[in-house]
């Protein structure tokens, strides 16, 4: 039963209460979020089963305009009277057929009571024909009685299901044993004395079942049945039901012999016969198979499945297929039980004691959160590994290793790269230039500062490799310690990891801390703030008002981003100016609007028009204040936000009232203003009131509700998730009030439009950021100082935060240094390999995990939660330090002495047509006027530092090719694109206010656009096409599209790595359970999983293969792949894990080729065959990733080979755009279009399908298709002379 959280009706019609599911080893139950008591009966009784029945009978069950709504409501509602009256058919009897087909489902039309010949459709027609009520009403009462009995039965079944949905184990003394009938039965499949799988038990079931008899019955029935999907399913279902009824009734006639002794130790005797209850469990598994492949209810199927059923029903009925699939399902459930037992042992059993308080939903939730947090680091590590690997790709485009984190790779790098680097100045220049993309390396940009010593830089990179290797091997591999515990091990003097000298890393993080002042100055400059505001103005704002800038303050995960706050505030401000600003003078300006005292907070949010730079400077100034002043101050004074929680609810209620009253005024001219409507239902009505608790506690409640609602929305339940919007609105008002309080006196001077006149940029910056930092008006707070990481002999080691930035950075080099906080230094080296976007995503995951620590329950071995919370906050601020001090691409490129100036010839020539460089106009897109210096392009630099361009040259040869024709088209569009964009924006504002017209046609409401609006939409679409084409060309020419493909590549690989970690974790739990049940020796388990040596780098696959004997291997192969495998066959499957886990797809070359990405996906599915749900999730995960993050829809085709299903992309055209829909208010999916409308076909396309913008052009989609299919072995075949689009 799938039920974790469910919203149900409360005391009022519109009130919704969240019920959550809980289970332990004795029972399952439901409880309200606000209570701890068992509320299962109460919750089930309040669930709306009547609504479900209305939905089964009516096509739109909750639309009270449906002509049959009241009729069906009377049949379904226990307290409703049956309505036995004809409906209005506009005097045309033929309309009845139309109304029945349009409004009743097939199930509803054919619904009839037991022992009755009248369907619901027949009874409706009798009522319409005027048949007396006394003749029709008894039949309707029978249907009503049948529905009421069904509702009662469904409630009883749901109650029983919930109660029985418990953890299927119990404690007998200190022994964790199966407790449910089904789990006891499944565990009998393990033959403990012989330490094998009990195949004879399943064979005996099939012998008793005698499937050939059922097959003959099904075949005879289908020979007489039409070959439609539902007919086939019903026929098979009826034959199966009759056959199983006979087996249950006559069971004793088929079985002879004594029943076996109960328990796991059954000995696997050939004479063993199952008792009836166990055989009934087997029958249930057979029924589940037929329910899946022969679904009787249409809701369990779709067009694709129906077609497959019609084409393959004979195969689905074959004994070989049925037996294989039923056995697999049974064994999968056994494995799931063993894994669950091993999981509970792993997490909650230590020192021979069970943590019994966690053998329940709290414990299972604890496990889920811990594993999800560790997995969140995997994607970031995948990026870091790729970037480190890019350091060591030599000029011949070959790499000498598969995985940089292995010992073999490190030795190869030392001998083949670092030794050459030490003596080759050209290599050193190139090495420094690449390293400057990641770390604050000194390259010849200052005369008074020497270059970094090459030996120090080599040590830096070695430290980075060690750090990433350490994190990878303890994250990609399943380890007992949490990520935080693994980091703290680095500071343990007894740990081998403590031997790593991080003194060079400490020097580089010291530079970042010292650079904060300069970086902040650069931010003020690059954001345009110093161009529009004089120094004394900025200084007064910050110094006089007491605004301090903190680098970072730990946030709650619900706190909205500034861009969302400002956008919402600007929209509200605009709406209030339009609707409530003074109109009698015709003055709609900002000044007159400021008189509206009630909404003064919104006046800080001014719409940025046409990308005006002075407006952007103002917005950027507010952004700095939001992140570095407002949010840090909220930590000290929560009232800055909490004062606006209840006020925002009240504001929303009043807005709803005013909107309804305005609507009524327009609709009813005689509406009396004294009769204003008072509403109790509004968007934020269900949001809990603030009652004085801490902001963290309030946001925790809100987050729980938000996550529960997000899940319901994902499951296609009705309604919106308003919790995110609510907290955003709260912050809009709160931040506006903060600005009003702090900067009210400077408002007129701060707000645009502004002029650059008489503002000297350099003078302003010098005044704001003098050489003597103590004279600066900015007090920049950072929790880290130099002494956080380095102890200098004889000096204080206090961690003074604010003073870190105020120091001049000088120290006595003779002082002896003692490096500390290696946990932070290790993570710093890794973080420096990430982009800003990746750091933000990772930081968000850390924030969510930190916030969860306060509300989750923890087992007895987690005793240092305060220290964990503090470490998480430190790591979050470390991420902010790295993100804040990350140099821009132009800044890095300007420092480069070599590398960047040759990047086009070295890295990108294969992606650009030669004709481009022969034409002066198109050549200028990549080179400056000297024809030698490349134009600095962000995505080319990012690709150069991160992507496997040596591989992409082969994968995308002929696919990603920038042509002279495309460049000329781009140049032409560049000259006029602003006109198109401005026109598009103006038309969008106009079209937002138009509405579709409606006309009655054949009794249907038909929609259309009038001619005037049609031409506006036509012009909008034409402009949109030009803007979209420009974006496609721009993204391709500046290589943003190739970088997007690289991101897709990394994200897919990271998801796949996550699945290999799932496999390793599950094997750990499975083997642990096998040890616990006495079928695997503990020494073998220890040899595989419990290597605690400091140089342990995994090798999990090799250890499994080498440490299992023949009997162990046969048992594991039966459990995981349902067949006995020899050593080579077994090894061939589990070795599929390594190229995925080690990201070998990125490092392959023609001489060292790997499988295609498509093949790796299928290999992963084979590896996960022990868990069908997880196996099927592989392609779904990739589909969801591409769809949700990249607007790409992918189609897979399944084929069967030797009993295994393989998925492939049949054609590269199976990669499609998921378009962006514009003017959504004109998009009506299921509707009729007025046939007399102007340009009918165009209107039908726009209204029914939406006004679409394709995110990618066809050439990029083909590149993505080839990313999946490319294989060096098929290189000549797959990439020779492709047709360029």
From Swiss-Prot:
Residues 1039-1285 are annotated as: HEPN-like fold 2. Residues 353-510 are annotated as: HEPN-like fold 1. The keyword RNA-binding applies. Target RNA acts as an activator for non-specific ssRNA degradation. GO terms for molecular function: endonuclease activity; RNA binding. CRISPR (clustered regularly interspaced short palindromic repeat), is an adaptive immune system that provides protection against mobile genetic elements (viruses, transposable elements and conjugative plasmids). CRISPR clusters contain sequences complementary to antecedent mobile elements and target invading nucleic acids. Unlike many single-component effectors, this CRISPR-Cas system targets RNA. CRISPR clusters are usually transcribed from pre-CRISPR RNA (crRNA) and processed into crRNA but this protein does not have detectable pre-cRNA processing activity on any tested pre-crRNA. This is CRISPR-associated endoribonuclease Cas13a. The gene is cas13a.
